[in-house]
């Protein structure tokens, strides 16, 4: 089975409308890419970007899917789009992308700052509280009200769908690992 290839396109969104065309974002690992996308949305000071993330079995298909993803996001008025070339996965990714975007956009500036430290930087709540000079209870309330566990869940689901089914499900017969099948 070929390794997963990723491509990402980003374009600034201005108050006068989008700036079509975009630029190719450097892609490392999928978790790093999702950190970058989420982090860019949580940065309430910088410019807003629209992202199109494509997955494929080679660089050309990943780049083509990224172009489709950003165009679809632009057409839907969203800042986030995904495409894999698999209609079933793409439909689920579209719905999850809407949910993730809504959750991130609903965060207050303080919740966004805390979300960046927890979800992107991987800091523990106590570390965030110390860094911000607030109580741990304040951070805990922000995590709950900002629905950070739901954001993390949506992110994990998106990551799993972009990667696709595990090889066992593809080659293990009826979706069961060979060792788990009765003999």
Task: State the predicted function of each range.
Residues 140-141:
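Key DNA-contacting residues within the recognition helix of helix-turn-helix
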Residues 124-132:
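Short alpha-helical "recognition helix" segments of helix-turn-helix
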Residues 74-98, 102:
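Flexible, glycine/charge-rich interdomain/linker segments that couple
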Residues 147-162:
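Short, Lys/Arg-enriched C-terminal cap helix and immediately downstream tail that follows
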């Amino acid at each position: 089975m070929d390794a997963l290839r990723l491509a990402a396109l980003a374009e600034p969104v201005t108050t006068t409308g989008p700036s079509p065309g975009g630029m190719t974002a450097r892609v490392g690992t999928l978790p790093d890419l999702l950190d970058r996308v989420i982090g860019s949305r949580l940065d309430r000071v910088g410019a807003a970007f629209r992202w199109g993330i494509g997955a494929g079995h080679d660089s050309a298909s990943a780049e083509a899917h990224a172009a489709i993803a950003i165009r679809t996001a632009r057409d839907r008025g969203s800042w986030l789009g995904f495409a894999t070339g698999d209609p079933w996965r793409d439909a689920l990714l579209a719905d999850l992308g809407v949910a993730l975007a809504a959750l991130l956009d609903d965060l207050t500036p303080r919740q966004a700052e805390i979300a960046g430290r927890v979800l992107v930087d991987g800091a523990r709540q106590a570390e965030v509280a110390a860094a911000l000079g607030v109580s741990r209870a304040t951070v805990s309330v922000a995590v709950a009200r900002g629905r950070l566990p739901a954001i993390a869940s949506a992110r994990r689901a998106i990551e799993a769908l972009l990667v696709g089914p595990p090889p066992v499900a593809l080659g293990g017969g009826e979706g069961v690992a060979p060792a788990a099948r009765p003999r």
